[in-house]
Amino acid sequence: MTQKIRTRFAPSPTGFIHLGNIRSALYPWAFARATGGDFILRIEDTDVERSSQAAVDVIIEGMRWLGLDHDEGPFYQMQRMDRYKAVLAEMQAAGQVYPCYMSVAELDALREKQMAAKEKPRYDGTWRPEPGKTLPPIPAGVQPVLRFKNPQGGSVVWDDKVKGRIEISNDELDDLVIARPDGTPTYNFCVVVDDIDMAITHVIRGDDHVNNTPRQINIFRALGKDVPVYAHLPTVLNEQGEKMSKRNGAKPVTQYAAEGYLPDAMVNYLARLGWSHGDDEIFSREQFLKWFNLDHLGKSAAQFDEAKLRWVNAQHLKATADDKLAELVQPFLAARGVGLDTARMVGGCGLFKDRCSTLVELADWLQLLVTGGQPSAQDISTHVTEAVRPALGKLADALVACEWSKAAIAAAIKQVLAETGLKMPQLAMAVRVLVMGTPQTPSLDAILELMKREDVISRLKI
């Protein structure tokens, strides 16, 4: 029977989650969904001083907004300490770990000596028990760390789904600290126990973890467990070519929601930020999941481009049904205290969406249907001329009695043009400036139909 795919996203809740982080959630989520597998959310919160529940909430909120639903979790490492300590005890009984009493000062002195000799700084195995070896006397009052007995000789080899075959000599790896003096386990050990207990089959994560992988593989093997498949994703760079980070100006994922980006557009953009399906640039979530596999993950660092993100978002806005857009934009209007009935909101979405890159821009247009805009002095002087003013009064009078429909409004405009001899652009530009605050709008009769009759008439009577 084919083994069920199980992937995970395991962030540390030490700050907000940005686009580089969330891409490391998108791909394992997509792989699980594309293969009928399970996606697990795990919170690696062992850094107690820096971790916070607020950061966890932001992570979950960002994933929920993007629709990256998890099948199991969230699991918290701090709630699994008893399990880690039980496995540590088993390994200690099997002679796979040992206590090390070397002090921080002794380790620092060792590193300085190695660096002076142009050697790689590493633990030298002073306290590693070996047949026939005499260990130093145990110092009084010192709580030891526990170190993992890394294999000596040979190498660790794995076929990375992004980077290809990777081989690391065990001679390059020292004996890893897997428990601190107070008994709390360290990151690399906890990760392995979690991946075993949660039956993770594929670890898809950033390539800043590549150096951890051989150490983790050796712990898997010491515990007699199968090693998962690894895929280490290249770094996401910001627009300046630096690694994306809070320090370098990255924004929280949730800020993009507030700026009016669509979740499916963000998934589309992030998917392309390290994966490809031929030349396809715009695709739905369903298409992405149909196409996604690990074979087309990029090997080079991807660079974030906000202008490209806005373009992708604009394409998704245009493709979204008007009634769905109305649902999405309504909270943006409500936050401004702007009330617009559903029918007019749906109609406005159809009129304006081709002019917008975000929901915020769409809300800007829809708001004008209610509040009008403040025209510039330049637009007034250019378009609302003495030659046009009489026609504006005639149009206001005609609109008082006519049916409030696009066809009737168009007929009223046509009648005023016939009576005054004006050309359509002369009258239309003036009306747009007065009722919407800008000479650049969609079809005038369609715009006026979506506005309240009394608002239009009052703005035309100057």
Curated annotation (Swiss-Prot):
Signal peptide: none
GO BP terms: glutamyl-tRNA aminoacylation
Position of sequence motif 'KMSKS' region: 243-247
Gene3D superfamilies: 1.10.10.350, HUPs
Segments for region (Disordered): 120-140
Main localization category: cytoplasm
One of the record's GO molecular function terms: ATP binding
GO cellular component, one term: cytosol
EC number(s) stated in the UniProt entry for this protein: 6.1.1.17
UniProt biased composition (Basic and acidic residues): 120-131
Subcellular location: Cytoplasm
Positions of ATP binding: 246
Motif ('HIGH' region): 11-21
Function in brief: Catalyzes the attachment of glutamate to tRNA(Glu) in a two-step reaction: glutamate is first activated by ATP to form Glu-AMP and then transferred to the acceptor end of tRNA(Glu).
Protein's recorded name: Glutamate--tRNA ligase
Protein's organism: Polaromonas sp. (strain JS666 / ATCC BAA-500)
